[in-house]
Amino acid sequence: SIPLFALAWSSLAVSAPIKPQKISEAMVYTLPGKTYEQVREDLTAAIEERGMVISAVSHVKDMIDRTSTDLGYKQGIYATGGETVLFCKADLSQAMMRDNVHNIALCPYGISVYTLAAEPNKVFVSYRIPPKLKVYQPIHRLLDDIVQSVAE
């Protein structure tokens, strides 16, 4: 006979963390089985649930679409989204800037959500990672934690 608590635990779905790819200076995650709208909504919730405030949303896709033909490009890059959500966490930002006042350029943090024109059914989430800054490691962990919660 299997104990009741074992049955309860076995019915819980535990998802493994998704693994990002490091592409250039960005960590890029592919979130299968989710729509852009779901991911964008979940990202907002994940940031706010951690007590942070979104300071701005950069509409990168709109700028790319608006300027493509003027620059000689025939096709856009992004199918939907193409937004970067900007926010900070006071304690981590304080530590980063007290380590080096010029780290102000690394704040706010940004997480981008988008689908590609070439792959409209895949939702991507990405963020920048500065090269080898020890003081940025807690921020990197925070950003990964946020994306992992969005992926669940």
Question: Language-model features: where?
Answer:
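Compact, glycine-rich, soluble single-domain proteins
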Residues: 55-106
